[in-house]
Amino acid sequence: QAAGADPLEFRLAHLSNERLRNVLEAAAARFGWRERRKRRVAARGIGLACGTEKGSVVAACVEVAADRASGRIQVLGICQAFECGAIQNPANLKAQAEGCVIMTLGGTLKEEIRFENGRILNARFSRYPVPRFADVPAIETILLNRPDLASAGAGETPMIAVPPAVANAVFDACAVRLRSLPLRAEALNA
């Protein structure tokens, strides 16, 4: 958006990595990126991001509700496309990818060690914020099988596109650019 272009079109115009283009196009198509960009809803935004890690590629499209007055950020839905070469076990790979998304939402929106006067305030798990079932949005995962490639890393790659996609969606919703994790709700109404 800072470049004066649609975020998807900007990336597609500048990406030379065919595998990244493929996951980005797959996620955007299933998410309905172009249609959603046309119909704007107040206090809602969409964002996308893509990346590569350990020989795998991933793209995520996200919808959020972000309210500046209350500082509330809620992820409403995530569509990710993931390609890690030849898929050996599709059911396990999908479970791994979706587990990565849920784990990453914690670090994106909630998880942090809090300090005051050099002391840890949330030294117990009971005081450490992690996602609850109610925090988990609808997740759609598209697996792109590439039997022509060797199997590559599937452990953490699905995590890398979620935080920037959520941050981009928050910016789309309320024009506030959050650049550090967790995305702090207080920053929305500062």
Predicted segments with their positions:
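Cofactor-binding beta-sheet edge motifs in enzyme active sites
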Residues: Q1-A190
